[in-house]
Amino acid sequence: MRLRKKWWARPEMEASPLCIVNPKDYKGKWREEFKNDNEIYLELGCGRGDFVTNIANKHPEKNYVAIDLKDEVIAIALRKITESEVQNVRIAPLQIAFINEVFDKDEIARIYINFCNPWPKDRHKKRRLTHTKFLTKYKEFLKPNSQIWFKTDDDGLFVESLDYFKECGFQIKFMTYDLHKSGFDKNIVTEYESKFLKLGINIKFLIAELK
């Protein structure tokens, strides 16, 4: 997704109490930020914020942290979150390679990874958010029995991710190659998901649990 530079993005981010512009400063302090002891769920690559806004509205008893890289993307998502008036979301700019510098041990109870870049070339596969390189980082801050919910349209990424999860000690609790015909009733449809469905592309989905 290529977006033009938006001059207003960083000032809006810095002015909003919902945006954490220096997330590394909050390691071990996220419960203080939310001012409660509710479980914290993490979305990696939140895009325009549709998913996190909808799920936070549906589950006010949980806290959500949404991460993306570019200010232009964060700012659009921030406006959506702000307009929805949800208070249980914080959004932050971050290169996900540094995600283990943002959360402390047992600080996160669930991770959502929705339609991440599949990086199909062999030399790029270590950039996948489901690669063992990243899963090892997530394990540093996930609570025992935490889950990763992973959705993709890409067959190759999905199949290889199954191996990544198993290699890193996760147990596959649920898996389907066609989410919308699986009977799974806890799905929140994302913007990309809607587009893929219109094209007749099956959505692959799994829940991996950390043991």
From Swiss-Prot:
GO molecular function: tRNA (guanine(46)-N7)-methyltransferase activity
EC number, UniProt record: 2.1.1.33
Pfam family name, one: Methyltransf_4
Pathway the protein takes part in: tRNA modification; N(7)-methylguanine-tRNA biosynthesis
SUPFAM superfamilies, per the entry: S-adenosyl-L-methionine-dependent methyltransferases
Catalytic activity, as annotated: guanosine(46) in tRNA + S-adenosyl-L-methionine = N(7)-methylguanosine(46) in tRNA + S-adenosyl-L-homocysteine
Name of protein: tRNA (guanine-N(7)-)-methyltransferase
Species this chain originates from: Clostridium acetobutylicum (strain ATCC 824 / DSM 792 / JCM 1419 / IAM 19013 / LMG 5710 / NBRC 13948 / NRRL B-527 / VKM B-1787 / 2291 / W)
Gene giving rise to this polypeptide: trmB
